[in-house]
Amino acid sequence: MSCDLKLEYLLRDRPYDPAVAPADYDMLCVKSGGAELYGEILWPDGGFQGPRPCVLLCHGYPGVARNDDLAAALRRIGCGVAVMHHRGAWGSQGKYLVSNCVEDVAALAVYMRSPAFCEAYHTDPDALFLIGHSMGGSNVLQAARCTQGLRGLILLTPYD
């Protein structure tokens, strides 16, 4: 991997330094199956150097949890974190169908390894991790079967 993570900041914020750009986030919009998927990208403060690892965080069944606490912890240690929502969930376009979820995860992973994404968010295309919680764990596992270049998977209480 191209950088060192700062695990000491997993559960607490880094000390304030007015000379360092603060951590921030932006909205994302990615196409999958002809629909626009909405979400956010969170990135760490400017104290982290070099291209960063990036995580695609996939929630479980819509309406359950977005896992904001996990996204914030990963950002604090130096990861870029994308939290996206499948077609028809949390305001994304299209109709929610379980059968679309794997396609959505795969489309997001391909986009997050693209030169445009990596340049815009200073991430390493060879350090993309997928994390899935509950039904998101199953979606991540299935998407990984048809997605090249992933660094790793983390399944949290996966549901099949």
Residues covered by each model-derived region:
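Alpha/beta-hydrolase fold nucleophile elbow
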Residues: E119-S134
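Short beta-strand element of the alpha/beta-hydrolase
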Residues: G50-G60
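Alpha/beta-hydrolase active-site loop
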Residues: Y96-H122
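Glycine-rich nucleophile elbow surrounding the catalytic serine of serine-hydrolase chemistry
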Residues: G132-Q142
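Conserved alpha/beta-hydrolase
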Residues: R75-Q93
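The serine-hydrolase catalytic nucleophile loop
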Residues: G60-A73
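N-terminal cap/lid segment of alpha/beta-hydrolase-fold proteins
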Residues: S2-Q49
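Active-site nucleophile loop of the alpha/beta-hydrolase fold
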Residues: I154-D160
